[in-house]
Amino acid sequence: MPIVTVKFLEGRSDEQKRALVERVTEAVAETIQANPEKIHVVLEEMRKDHYGVAGKRISDQ
């Protein structure tokens, strides 16, 4: 049972998240010959003030 976690900044539409789940599932199924019914995709949206790069929060840039 593959479990894939995708972390990204907030702001994506439901349509984008739906497409992401579908495409990640397809890629994993094809790459490791896994049954798509057994593939789990976890989406973790991060607030821009909860993520930083180069010492600065994304929300402050």
Swiss-Prot record:
**What Gene Ontology molecular function terms does this protein carry?**
isomerase activity
InterPro entries xref list: 4-OT (IPR018191), 4-OT-like_dom (IPR004370), Tautomerase/MIF_sf (IPR014347)
Q: Give its E.C. classification number.
A: 5.3.2.-
UniProt-annotated catalytic positions: P2 (proton acceptor)
* CDD domains reported in the protein's UniProt record: 4Oxalocrotonate_Tautomerase
**Keywords in alphabetical order:** Isomerase
Q: Which SUPFAM superfamilies match?
A: Tautomerase/MIF
Q: Which family does it belong to?
A: Belongs to the 4-oxalocrotonate tautomerase family.
Report what the protein is called: Probable tautomerase BH3814
Q: Which organism is it from?
A: Halalkalibacterium halodurans (strain ATCC BAA-125 / DSM 18197 / FERM 7344 / JCM 9153 / C-125)
